[in-house]
Design a protein with these regions (language model features):
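A glycine/proline-hinged amphipathic helix-loop "lid/cap" segment
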Residues: 1-66, 222
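Short beta-strand-to-loop junctions in surface cap/lid or active-site-entrance loops
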Residues: 60-72, 229-234
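Short beta-strand element of the alpha/beta-hydrolase
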Residues: 72-83
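Short amphipathic alpha-helix adjacent to the substrate-entry channel of hydrolases
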Residues: 90-110, 125
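Gly/Ser-rich "nucleophile elbow"/oxyanion-hole loop immediately N-terminal to the catalytic nucleophile
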Residues: 135-150
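Alpha/beta hydrolase fold serine-hydrolase catalytic domain that processes acyl esters and thioesters
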Residues: 145, 161-250
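Short beta-strand immediately N-terminal to the catalytic nucleophile in serine-hydrolase-like folds
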Residues: 150-152, 181
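Gly/Ala-rich beta-loop-alpha elbow adjacent to hydrolase catalytic centers
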Residues: 152, 156, 160
Length: 250
């Protein structure tokens, strides 16, 4: 197992010294504001990209493109993390910019509805609908439909996977690949990694469970999209797993 990066190790030490506070103890507004404030940890903002916020068919998107990009590009449809209850363009802007610059891809982030205001399957429906909208508008957006990747972190990883599975079931079109960044795939928090990494690494087992509880309050555990153990897509890449609670699923 790799050692923690120095700055992260310091944050973990401070978290433990503070008594391992849980996001469950915060009201939803404070929880969301804290997530926005944490965006400073992502470092400097990449400026060598073009950023456009657009609305298509009632859903908001942030389109981040390499400068002077012409013609259809490989495209990453991105779903932000936040335990289904927080996050958005403000929390992930730096990551989206960096991804577009470093990859040379067009990156299109989908803003989905959050719990507790909107519960399951609202976020999943928005994620799937967002992907379909992007593909329908591929030409004006400059999207190469043969090279679409679905990606997301944490709750967004869940949304990317379920969107791919829904597309497969519908038999319409498929993404070229998935990129799942420490995805939330176990709504029961019962896997080995939840047990071994569930207390000390800031994003705790209780924090994730509190997000699931707000998003899935009336969902039967037998529902096929109540992700516990699920078959991973054949062309799937997972990142950031060494100390994560979700490691057991990749």
């Amino acid at each position: 197992m790799m050692a923690l990066e120095q700055g992260i190790a310091r944050l973990v030490e401070e978290f433990i010294a503070a008594g391992r506070p849980s996001s469950r103890q915060q009201n939803i507004d404070d929880r969301r504001a804290g997530y926005v404030a944490s965006a400073v940890l992502a470092g400097e903002s990449e400026t060598r990209v073009q950023v456009d916020d657009i609305t298509l068919e009632g859903i908001n998107f942030r389109v981040v493109s390499p400068q002077n990009a012409a013609g259809p590009l490989p495209t990453v449809i991105y779903y932000h993390g936040g335990c289904f209850v927080s996050g958005g363009f403000a929390t992930h802007d730096k990551q989206l910019r960096q991804l577009a610059y470093e990859s040379g891809c067009r990156v299109i982030a989908v803003q989905y509805r959050l719990a507790p205001e909107q519960t399951f399957p609202a976020a999943h429906n928005d994620a799937e609908r967002g992907a379909q909208i992007i593909r329908r508008h591929a030409e004006p957006l400059g999207v190469d439909t043969s090279r679409i990747t679905l990606a997301g972190d944490s709750a967004g990883g869940n949304l990317a996977l379920v969107t791919a599975l829904r597309l497969k079931a519908a038999g319409t079109w498929l993404p070229a690949q998935l990129i799942l960044i420490y995805p939330m795939l176990d709504a029961t928090a019962a896997s080995a990694s939840y047990i071994s990494n569930g207390e000390d690494y800031i994003i705790t087992r209780d924090t994730l469970l509190s997000g699931y509880e707000m998003y899935l309050p009336a969902t039967e555990s037998a529902h096929p999209e109540y992700l516990h153990r699920i078959n991973i897509w054949p062309f799937t890449t997972g990142f950031g797993m060494s100390f994560k609670l979700m490691r057991s699923f990749m």
